[in-house]
A protein has these predicted regions:
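Transmembrane helical bundles and short interhelical boundary loops of multi-pass, membrane-embedded
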Residues: 1-6, 10, 61, 94-157
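Membrane-embedded alpha-helical segments of multi-pass membrane proteins
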Residues: 32-36, 79-87, 127-134
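Aromatic/glycine/proline-enriched transmembrane-helix motif characteristic
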Residues: 2-70, 146
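Membrane-interface helix-boundary signature
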Residues: 23-30, 51-58, 77, 94-97, ...
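Membrane-interface catalytic loops of GT-C/OST-like multi-pass glycosylation enzymes that act
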Residues: 72-83, 116-124
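Hydrophobic alpha-helical transmembrane segments
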Residues: 43-49, 66-73, 88-93, 112-116
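Juxtamembrane/interfacial segments around transmembrane helices
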Residues: 16-24, 83, 88-93, 105-117
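Hydrophobic, membrane-inserted alpha-helices
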Residues: 37-41, 61-68, 81-88, 107-112
Length: 157
């Protein structure tokens, strides 16, 4: 369809594979891919008995907030606010992870620059790599938290 796109200024997966072609096919496949990724993440987290802390809630909120717009089609740049807020709050607890919200905010800023300045500061094809890097680093932090023996609940008899 004329004027339709799989990516609406959010630097996600569809800028890597092409946001203009196969819109109907990729749209449906993207929704199913997103569902599969979420189910895998939920299964992995759900099979562990974890101590729920503020750190984990903020970290998981940031991870889910990055995961959804990266894999779902037709995401606007404003959908990253959720992740940015959680990552900024996470940095209050873990200041050494300051780079997570900084780089995520950079990609959002680039998405807005097309409207404000009518120009991309960096070609959009490079931006998903920054978003993917932040997503992977945040996912790794979730993985470390889940597998830390200090965060496991002890089973009682």
């Amino acid at each position: 369809a004329e004027g339709w796109s799989l990516a609406l200024k959010y630097s996600n997966l569809y800028y890597l594979i092409g946001e203009k072609g196969f819109i109907d096919e990729y749209h449906s496949a993207g929704i199913w891919l997103s569902l599969a990724v979420f189910m895998i993440v939920l299964y992995y987290i759900g099979r562990k008995k974890l101590k729920i802390s503020a750190e984990f809630i903020l970290l998981l909120g940031g991870f889910v907030g990055l995961l959804a717009p990266f894999f779902l089609p037709q995401m606007h740049e404003r959908y990253s606010f959720f992740a940015e807020v959680f990552l900024i709050l996470y940095v209050i607890l873990k200041p050494q992870k300051f780079y997570l919200p900084v780089f995520q905010s950079l990609t959002s800023f680039m998405g807005y620059s097309i409207f404000v300045a009518q120009d991309w500061s960096l070609p959009i094809q490079y931006m998903p790599f920054i978003t993917l890097t932040v997503l992977c680093l945040t996912g790794y932090e979730v993985y470390k938290y889940i597998n830390d023996p200090g965060n496991q609940e002890v089973a009682s008899c």
